[in-house]
């Protein structure tokens, strides 16, 4: 985990705090982005203890759905996360075909 970028650590910590471990507890990148932008105690996660408060705030402010998806794809390639086949999910009244992800 030490080799991960601070941004990847934020995304991993969000998955962990949401309880997205194992295929029965998967979540979408949209839910992760919402969790990151709305959760005040995310910085208290053990993985983020060494990230300075200013760096943490900068990371949170720069996060968007594209960056979250890119970071999740990187975590999947490293074998840390797992993705599902796309499923049809309604988000904000719009039906989308999305993958769900979870920590292995």
PLM segments and residue spans:
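Short amphipathic alpha-helical interaction segments
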Residues: 59-77
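Short alpha-helical segments that sit at the start of domains
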Residues: 1-38
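Hydrophobic, Leu/Ile/Phe/Ala-enriched alpha-helical segments that form helix-helix packing faces
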Residues: 15, 36, 51, 55, ...
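Short, cationic-aromatic polyanion-contact patches
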Residues: 86-104
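A short, conserved structural fragment
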Residues: 76-88
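Short, conserved alpha-helical segments within structured domains
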Residues: 7, 25-28, 52, 64-68
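DNA-recognition alpha helix
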Residues: 27-58
């Amino acid at each position: 985990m030490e080799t991960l970028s601070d941004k990847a650590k934020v995304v991993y910590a969000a998955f962990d705090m949401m309880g997205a471990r194992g295929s029965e507890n998967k979540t979408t990148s949209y839910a992760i982005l919402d969790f990151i932008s709305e959760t005040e105690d995310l910085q208290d996660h053990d993985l983020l203890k060494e990230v300075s408060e200013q760096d943490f705030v900068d990371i949170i402010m720069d996060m968007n759905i594209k960056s979250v998806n890119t970071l999740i794809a990187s975590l999947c390639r490293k074998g840390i996360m797992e993705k599902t086949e796309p499923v049809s999910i309604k988000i904000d009244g719009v039906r989308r075909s999305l993958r769900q992800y979870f920590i292995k």
